[in-house]
Amino acid sequence: MGCPNCGSTTFESDTASGNTYCTQCGVVVEQDAIVSEVTFGEASTGAAVVQGSLVSNDQTHARTFGGPYRNQGSVESRELTIANGRRRISALAIALKLNERHIEAAVRYFTLAINNNFIKGRRSQYVVASCLYIVCRISKTSHMLIDFSDILQINVFKLGSTFLKLCRVLRPNLPLLDPSLYISRFASLLEFGPETHRVANDAIRLVARMNRDWMQIGRRPAGICGACLLIAARMNNFRRSVREVVHVVKVADITIQKRLDEFKLTESGDLSIADFRNIWLEGQSDPPSFTKNQKFQQYGAQKVSNIDHTQEYMSPIKRTPDFDGNEVKSEELSQTVKVESQETPVHLKADEREIRKEVTETLKGDELRKISLQVNVKFSEEEVTLEDVDDDEIEDILLDKDEILTKTQVWMELNKDYLAEEEAKNLKLQEDLKKGIVRQPRKRRRYRPRDSTSDGIADTAAESAKEMMQQRAFSKKINYEALDMLFDEEQS
């Protein structure tokens, strides 16, 4: 660098003022130079003190000490928010047994959320859990969103909503969920003992087969894992009920049953255990939604064809032929009916009245009522059988005896408090009846809106006031006749 005035390259610097000037012409080349080196000074007590301040990468200004005391530095609210977020993330990561690298990555996502003003109006634990779950998804760990809600004791649906909104703001490149990541975790919770690894391998093979048959896309990974673990347990002679699997994978039992029904319709579902372990089918089945849609289309086409077939044999008769085979014209028919109606004798009308009277008396009698009761009792005593139903949806709804017993036990367990209260009420009512205490049910009065068509509407204000006083009966000392005279005087 040369002097801008004379071009000389000889300079001298004054460290006290921070200026640099040319020795030939005296022009100041630099002034107020900032020195980045660390300097030390001496305090009044003789201790060495570092001069200057440190500005980190996430700060907007240096911390200043506002007095002779050491711990009076000002801290920004943003720094305080990041520090609190780091503390919450560390506590949650320790509970989930995550590493330090997961904590640092989650803190970076939390800082990005602060920069985008995402934390305003939201609880910090939802944002912290969402940031840490993003890191778990990217790192492909076996943690699920419901694990975070169990630890933090928060609603999993609200947490999922916050996670989706954070993904829309930050747009992280999240991989698709692979159900095989959760197989080992769920298998260890089902306690297969030394056969855990073997069961997990069979379940992972089942997951790959379901993915090949288009059963994994668009489905919750927990439901796929539950169905695969249930099949793998049966393949290795372990008796695990659907309720035990539901308790581990935390999905509904009907979800696992649907996955099992869908797998049963594939080609792999027809293989034996040895063939499934040794043979890998190269083909793939149609997606379950496609197969279901085909069934609906076939059912609709069959229904339309049945309607068309019925209409062919039941075409409407436009004209009425006579006995000789000749068609009767509509004009002649109307004239004939008109003449017959005019020539109807009087005694036929009287007979018709007598017939109507007899029918009415028969309908009002007790014999018809007894016959109807006998028919109703007969139909109520008959057992309803639905074995001949060929509808797939109704067959899925119907339960067998074991399922009915299980569902009854579940219902009794859930409603045992209500049943106990009802039993206590019945016992108390029986004791009151034995003691002669009879409590009649209180009838509610039905208040109907009154209009001009209602009965008992007062014509004048005096009558209305009189009716109100008689109905309410505020006092027996009121002279109702004086009320009539009072209103008469006002009207006059």
From Swiss-Prot:
CDD domains found in the cross-reference section: CYCLIN_TFIIIB90_rpt1, CYCLIN_TFIIIB90_rpt2
Compartments where located: Nucleus
**Family matches, as PROSITE patterns:** ZF_TFIIB
Write down the superkingdom of origin: Eukaryota
Please name the SUPFAM superfamilies in this protein's record.
Cyclin-like, Zinc beta-ribbon
Where Zn(2+) binds, per the record, is at 3, 6, 22, 25
Zinc fingers (TFIIB-type) by residue: 1-30
Cellular component per GO? nucleus; transcription factor TFIIIB complex; transcription preinitiation complex
Keyword vocabulary terms for this entry: Activator, Metal-binding, Nucleus, Transcription, Transcription regulation, Zinc, Zinc-finger
Q: Name one GO biological process term.
A: DNA-templated transcription initiation
Does the record carry Protein transport as a key word? Answer: no
Q: Which residues form a coiled coil?
A: none
The record's similarity note reads: Belongs to the TFIIB family.
This protein's assembly is summarised as: TFIIIB comprises the TATA-binding protein (TBP), the B-related factor (BRF) and a third subunit (Potential). Interacts with maf1.
Q: What is this protein called?
A: Transcription factor IIIB 60 kDa subunit
Provenance organism: Schizosaccharomyces pombe (strain 972 / ATCC 24843)
Gene encoding this polypeptide? brf1
